[in-house]
């Protein structure tokens, strides 16, 4: 394992030039202190976990110190926000410090969020707050543990400094890891500013560094776009299957890698509600849970438009047409597994839809339903979960269908239980749990953030003494709508 001074940098994006980013030095925050660190994320850089205990760790990830090989950059991009095009966005408070190469040859971006003002800050102060930094840290690592592709979070660094949002809050910094921070909005920026040379440079960079398998295709750019469509179809299927609501699916928040990116007012479903809106600024429900599938397709079409400088329109349309069937296939596969089904039957999607309809009308906890359904033999489990439903006759009718479907499955009850517990989490990042951890951290107690992170790192395993993290939320904690402010 390595120490911090042994990290190897290879800053490929910075070498694209000043048309793509602006060099900016981090602006340190006062009295930096470690709030929480992820050993799993540190391992991606081959970092010794003990490095997090050293003063230099907080100093490097709070802007007080910088590696000689680092080349901190604020990236420029644009994007569609709530459907309207914003021509110039960019990193308003984050800096790409550089790209670290681990022993396996993988490149990882080190992106410091809350690093101060940049040319793209607009009227902002360039800072992040402890609340939003903790939320992103917890979500990044929790989604990864669930098997949902996501950027990663190395650490959160707190401070004694305060900044003004709706109220005065503690300033903090988050160190985010990803193989790339290129967004759909990067391509939109060069397309709408009519910079075809830079657009092609960026496309070639992404193709070479992140989609090398597409280089040998007859049409490499088209093959890359098709793969981006495929990755996003699988990503959104995983969101929907596990009840994750992103909240701000603007094109500048969409990663070119097909990973969950830029966490803001996200939420996991508590009681199942297909129309759930987690962002209190989204008064029309554009980014509701139910709309995430069509919005992802819309965002991909915005990316396709930006790629018309190098790909013909008709092939782009054909590639876009792959999204919905690919999404449906991935989603149904995941839901079959969540229901303990190992074979495929034509009516399986209808079985899933009828279950969700019963949940919608009954205020059923989405996560705990599937967990309880897999803890006992089918007939017994149906009796247990039945108590959660309002429409008992409707649920009983579904239960008869499901029992008959399970009887056509091979294998025994114990095998079914093991399969279902491996895909149905006991612990998810409910907003009220995050809020309790944030309130403790704002009072100077980081133990709850660290405990919650540890619990969520093993979501499928029952952990002794952690039952409180696996319960239905109190009434005040249900359907919390979160602000975009960060």
Curated annotation (Swiss-Prot):
Its EC number is 2.7.7.-, 2.7.7.108. Pfam families: SelO. The keyword Magnesium applies. Its cofactor is Mg(2+); Mn(2+). It catalyses: L-seryl-[protein] + ATP = 3-O-(5'-adenylyl)-L-seryl-[protein] + diphosphate; L-threonyl-[protein] + ATP = 3-O-(5'-adenylyl)-L-threonyl-[protein] + diphosphate; L-tyrosyl-[protein] + ATP = O-(5'-adenylyl)-L-tyrosyl-[protein] + diphosphate; L-histidyl-[protein] + UTP = N(tele)-(5'-uridylyl)-L-histidyl-[protein] + diphosphate. The active site is at 252 (proton acceptor). It is an enzyme of class 2 (transferase). Belongs to the SELO family. Nucleotidyltransferase involved in the post-translational modification of proteins. It can catalyze the addition of adenosine monophosphate (AMP) or uridine monophosphate (UMP) to a protein, resulting in modifications known as AMPylation and UMPylation. This is Protein nucleotidyltransferase YdiU. It comes from Pseudomonas entomophila (strain L48).
């Amino acid at each position: 394992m390595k120490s911090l001074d042994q990290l190897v940098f290879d800053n490929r994006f910075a070498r694209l030039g000043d048309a793509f980013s602006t060099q900016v030095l981090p602006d340190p925050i006062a009295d930096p202190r470690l709030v929480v660190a992820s050993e799993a994320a540190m391992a991606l850089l081959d970092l010794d976990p003990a490095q997090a205990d050293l003063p230099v760790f907080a100093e490097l990830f709070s802007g007080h110190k910088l590696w000689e090989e680092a080349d901190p950059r604020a990236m420029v991009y644009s994007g569609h926000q709530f459907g309207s095009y914003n021509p110039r966005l960019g990193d308003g408070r984050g800096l790409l410090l550089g790209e670290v190469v681990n022993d396996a040859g993988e490149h990882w971006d080190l992106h410091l969020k809350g690093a101060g003002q940049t040319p793209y800050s607009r009227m902002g102060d360039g800072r992040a707050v402890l609340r939003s930094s903790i939320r992103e840290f917890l979500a990044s690592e929790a989604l990864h543990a669930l098997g949902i592709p996501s950027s990663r979070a190395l650490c959160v660094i707190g401070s004694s400094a305060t900044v003004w949002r709706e109220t005065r809050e503690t300033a903090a910094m988050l160190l985010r890891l990803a193989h790339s921070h290129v967004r759909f909005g990067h391509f939109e920026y060069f397309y709408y500013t009519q910079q075809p040379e830079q657009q092609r440079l960026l496309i070639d960079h992404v193709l070479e560094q992140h989609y090398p398998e597409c280089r040998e295709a007859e049409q490499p750019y088209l093959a890359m776009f098709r793969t981006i469509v495929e990755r996003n179809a699988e990503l959104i299927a995983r969101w929907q299957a596990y009840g994750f609501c992103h909240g701000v699916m603007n094109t500048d928040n969409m990663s070119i890698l097909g990973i969950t990116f830029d966490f803001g007012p996200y939420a996991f479903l508590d009681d199942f509600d297909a129309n759930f809106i987690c962002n209190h600024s989204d008064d029309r429900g554009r980014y509701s849970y139910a709309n995430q599938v069509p919005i992802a397709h819309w965002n991909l079409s915005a990316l396709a438009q930006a790629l018309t400088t190098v790909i013909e329109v008709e092939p782009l349309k054909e590639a876009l047409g792959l999204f919905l069937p690919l999404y449906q296939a991935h989603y149904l596969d995941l839901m079959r597994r969540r229901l303990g089904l190992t074979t495929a039957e034509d009516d399986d999607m209808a079985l899933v839809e009828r279950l969700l309809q019963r949940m919608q009308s009954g205020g059923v906890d989405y996560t705990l339903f599937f967990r309880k359904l897999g803890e006992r033999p089918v007939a017994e489990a149906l009796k247990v979960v039945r108590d959660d439903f309002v429409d008992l006759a409707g649920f009983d009718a579904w239960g008869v269908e499901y029992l008959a479907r399970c009887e056509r499955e091979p294998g025994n009850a114990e095998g079914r239980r093991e399969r279902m517990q491996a895909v149905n989490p006991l612990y998810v990042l409910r907003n009220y749990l995050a809020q309790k951890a944030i309130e403790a951290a704002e009072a100077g107690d980081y133990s709850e953030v660290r405990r919650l992170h540890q619990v969520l790192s093993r979501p499928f395993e029952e952990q002794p003494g952690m039952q409180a993290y696996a319960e239905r939320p109190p009434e005040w904690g249900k359907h919390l709508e979160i602000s975009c402010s960060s």
